[in-house]
Every structure is written in C-alpha cells, then in structure tokens.
From Swiss-Prot:
Subunit field text: Part of the 30S ribosomal subunit.
Compartment(s) of residence: Plastid, Cyanelle
Family, per entry: Belongs to the universal ribosomal protein uS14 family.
Biological process annotations from GO: translation
GO cellular component assignments: cyanelle; small ribosomal subunit
InterPro entries, A to Z: Ribosomal_uS14, Ribosomal_uS14_bac/plastid, Ribosomal_uS14_CS
Name of this chain's protein: Small ribosomal subunit protein uS14c
Gene Ontology molecular-function annotations: rRNA binding; structural constituent of ribosome
KW RNA-binding (keyword) present: yes
Length: 100
C-alpha cells in the first residue's frame, strides 16, 4: 500500500492537470503554428508560467486499489499483484491462466 500523502499528491496533480489542460493545449497549438521566433519565445514563456504540476507527465499512474505506482496494467487500472489475485479469483472476465 502506498503512502496516503503520495496518493493525495497525485490527486492534486491530476486536478491541476485537468484545470489547465485546455489552456496548455491552446498554447501548444499556437506554438506549433507560428513561424516567428519572437512569438515562439513569448508563447514558450506563457507555457512556462503555468504550474509545473499541471503537466500531464507529472501525473503518476497508480493502482486504484492499492495505490502502487509501479507494475500497473493500463487496461485494468491495477498493479500486477492485484491483477494476479483478481484473475485467480475469476473477477476479470476473459482472463485465463495460460498453459501450453
């Protein structure tokens, strides 16, 4: 189980990301469309003024059950440990133990 403070920090980052998502996308599209160097510098400065934690790369994907930050399966949203236990219990439809 992950520390509660780390889980809450990630929730805060996700809220910030959602808050500034539209503004960040608008700035990035304008940055890619312009040709002048001066305007690119101004747009880049505006982009840097946004909060650091509002960047999507700062949000960590965590297991929704345990909060584990590593070894997550995106399709299920759980870590490898939880995935294994849920598969053994038959809680994941369509997942079977492989044998050959």
């Amino acid at each position: 189980m992950a520390k509660k403070s780390m889980i809450e920090r990630d929730k805060k980052r996700e809220n910030l990301m959602n808050k500034y998502l539209v503004k960040r996308q608008q700035l990035k599209t304008r940055l890619n469309e312009t040709d002048s160097v001066e305007e690119k510098l101004l747009l880049n400065q505006e982009l840097q003024k946004l909060p650091r934690n509002s960047a999507p790369s700062r949000v960590r994907i965590r297991c929704w059950l345990t909060g584990r930050p590593r070894g997550n399966y995106r399709d299920f949203g759980v870590s490898r440990h939880v995935l294994r236990e849920m598969a053994h219990q038959g809680l994941l439809p369509g997942v079977t133990k492989s044998s050959w």
